[in-house]
């Protein structure tokens, strides 16, 4: 098979059937086999992108979250952090919590974190025995809101429902955002690995859908700080629950998102 691939590559170079790629300023493709004018462009927009949102477009008009703007929005970010071996072996959860604590959060933003799912936390005070709920205060500080939120597996959809319910009741807002932090396996296995319950499996897309339906909160976006969760199946599943999906279709590095500048 390798010989076939190599021979095909050599043949392509000799015959010039490959597209030329210019890497000087991004990607630029020139197709020598046929002219671009032969494509049907009847459905393409002739209006240039000016960077301004068009509220009359069919997609933006379908948004379910109302954004007030002018610093009038109250935003509650729910971060569901199942630490797993990413925390116990590599401190990745602790690093990300520190990044969040170092962020400059506006007074109208509530960042609430649910912790659990690992046999060892590297930040003093975070329990490995119980799941807990924290509020990120900024200036390097986090505050424990719920010292004992039970010890259920974080891959259990009921645990996610309980967290969303807690946040929506105690931190009401006109914009809700959910970030699910851990391992991810896309359509195959869904989200999460709870190191304390290695036989509990992961949370499938169907179970995530069930949890979000039961919680009945409309999200501005649902994000997965996890591998392989950006796919059509996940997007379709979330279409009734959120306006946007933020995720990676590729494997992420263990450290995941950089929160200090993004929050």
Predicted regions located by residue number:
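Positively charged n-region of N-terminal signal peptides that target proteins for export
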Residues: 1-4
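Hydrophobic core
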Residues: 9-13
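C-terminal motif of bacterial Sec signal peptides marking the signal peptidase cleavage site
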Residues: 15-17
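N-terminal extension/subdomain marker
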Residues: 21-172
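Structural recognition of the beta-strand scaffold that forms the well-ordered cores
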Residues: 76-81, 110-115, 176-180, 220-224, ...
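Solvent-exposed loop/turn segments at secondary-structure junctions
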Residues: 83-87, 117-121, 182-188, 195-199, ...
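A short, glycine/acidic-enriched catalytic loop
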Residues: 140-144, 184-217
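Active-site-proximal C-terminal subdomain of hydrolase catalytic domains
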Residues: 217-263
């Amino acid at each position: 098979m390798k010989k076939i691939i190599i021979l095909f590559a050599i043949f392509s170079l000799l015959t010039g059937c490959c597209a030329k790629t210019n890497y000087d300023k991004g990607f630029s493709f020139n197709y020598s086999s046929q002219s671009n004018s032969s494509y049907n462009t009847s459905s393409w927009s002739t209006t240039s992108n000016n960077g301004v949102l068009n509220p009359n477009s069919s997609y933006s008009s379908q948004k379910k979250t109302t954004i007030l703007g002018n610093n009038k929005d109250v935003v509650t970010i729910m971060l569901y952090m199942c630490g797993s071996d990413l925390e116990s072996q590599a401190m990745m959860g602790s690093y990300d919590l520190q990044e969040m604590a170092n962020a400059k959060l506006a007074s109208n933003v509530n960042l609430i974190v649910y912790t659990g799912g690992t046999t060892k936390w590297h930040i003093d005070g975070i329990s490995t025995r119980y799941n807990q709920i924290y509020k990120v205060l900024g200036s390097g500080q986090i505050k424990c809101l719920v010292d004992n939120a039970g010890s259920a597996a974080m891959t259990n959809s009921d645990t996610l429902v309980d967290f969303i319910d807690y946040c929506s009741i105690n931190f009401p807002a006109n914009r809700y955002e959910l970030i699910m932090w851990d391992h991810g396996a896309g359509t195959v296995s869904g989200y999460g690995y709870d190191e304390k319950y290695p036989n509990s499996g992961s949370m499938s897309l169907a179970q995530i859908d069930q949890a979000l339906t039961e919680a009945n909160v409309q999200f501005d976006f649902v994000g997965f700080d996890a591998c392989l969760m950006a796919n059509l199946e996940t997007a379709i599943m979330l279409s009734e629950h959120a306006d946007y999906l933020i995720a990676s279709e590729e494997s992420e590095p263990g450290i995941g998102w950089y929160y200090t500048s993004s929050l």
